[in-house]
Swiss-Prot record:
UniProt cross-references to SUPFAM superfamilies, sorted A to Z: Ankyrin repeat
Lineage: Bacteria, Pseudomonadati, Pseudomonadota, Alphaproteobacteria, Rickettsiales
UniProt ANK repeat ranges: 63-94, 99-130, 134-164
Protein name: Putative ankyrin repeat protein RF_0011
Source organism (scientific name): Rickettsia felis (strain ATCC VR-1525 / URRWXCal2) (Rickettsia azadi)
Highest taxon, organism lineage: Bacteria
Keywords linked to the UniProt accession: ANK repeat, Repeat
InterPro entries named among the record's database cross-references: Ankyrin_rpt-contain_sf
């Protein structure tokens, strides 16, 4: 009786469970081969089409693998394209436990451009801006793979600091794009953007820390702290590349500033002042707008940035000791 009722309402839980288990078993097998046979690909696609209870596709196994992660890992483009519209965004963003990668990264390693293009708009900011243990971004991987359309999509979604980010070895996205001359279009796009952003950053640093007229106009330490915090917390750049642009900004013949001394100045400034300021920030609730430069008038985001910097970074020393310096 219950079986007939399920069929009447279009519920296929029992048969779907069996089909789903068959699908998982086949996908796991295909992740262990270099290239799947066409017959196996077709079987996977057939099983996906047969499963009516799409909630099953949102499940993950004990290793955090979803059907989409397994399909992407196996390089099954058509299977991935069938799965994506059947899954929730939350399931699409799931990360497996072994390598800590979502389906998007698996698809990128397998050169599944069309799958990546479908996945990127559904990915969370955290996954888009993820950095691995080697300091590499997804944009770096896309550049290395010569995925021009995918690279441009990342550029449109990423903040500037992620685009000019340097990995643990000091390599930039442009460095990754330049590893294969066949990817000339991707390389050119990224190099031009990197140059533009580094020049902008150099100008920003120069205006924040060198220009005497800014001090005369009343730009005080609180704003300087916010700018410096944003620089150090969010931006990890190749210091050698940045130095050349800083040198262009520093065109005062009487100035003794060097790129290295400028960066050191910012470093020392934050270490000396930021911890004490953060304690004040935590009890301030800015509730009005004014042209005053008082700390209580800083945007809430700026205050959160300062607090977050202290709580997460602490400059490698104990927080109490930092506050005493």
């Amino acid at each position: 009786m219950f079986t007939s009722v399920k069929k009447f309402f279009g519920i296929h839980e029992e048969s779907d469970e069996i089909l789903y288990n068959q699908l998982i078993s086949l996908l796991e097998k295909l992740t262990r081969v270099i290239t799947a046979k066409d017959s196996d690909k077709k079987e996977v696609e057939k099983l996906i089409d047969k499963i009516k209870n799409t909630n099953l596709f949102n499940q993950s196994d004990e290793n955090g693998n979803t059907t989409l992660i397994l399909a992407a890992d196996a390089g099954l483009e058509e299977a991935c394209l069938k799965l994506i519209p059947k899954m929730s965004d939350e399931a699409i963003n799931m990360i497996e436990n072994i390598r800590g990668q979502p389906a998007l990264v698996k698809a990128m390693w397998r050169d599944l451009d069309s799958v990546c293009i479908e996945l990127i708009p559904k990915m969370s900011k955290e996954n888009i801006n993820a950095i691995d243990n080697c300091g590499r971004t997804l944009l770096m991987l896309a550049a290395k793979k010569g995925m021009t359309t995918v690279s441009k999509m990342f550029i449109n979604l990423m903040p500037p600091e992620m685009i000019i980010h340097a990995d643990n070895e000091g390599n930039t996205t442009a460095s990754y794009a330049d590893t294969d001359h066949a990817f000339a279009d991707t390389t050119k796009t990224i190099k031009l953007l990197q140059e533009k952003l580094l020049k902008s950053l150099a100008s920003f640093i120069n205006k924040s820390f060198l220009k005497k007229d800014h001090v005369k106009k009343g730009v005080d330490n609180f704003f300087k702290i916010v700018w410096a915090t944003k620089f150090y917390k969010k931006i990890k750049v190749n210091k050698e590349l940045l130095a050349s642009y800083l040198q262009e900004q520093n065109n005062d013949p009487e100035s003794t500033n060097t790129p290295e001394s400028m960066i050191k100045t910012m470093n020392n400034f934050i270490k000396l002042h930021l911890f004490a300021i953060a304690g004040v920030c935590k009890i301030i609730q800015p509730a009005f707008e004014t042209s005053s430069l008082h700390l209580s008038c800083l945007p809430k985001e700026a205050i959160c940035c300062i607090i977050s910097h202290l709580e997460n970074e602490k400059w490698g020393v104990d927080a109490v000791l930092l506050g005493e310096n």
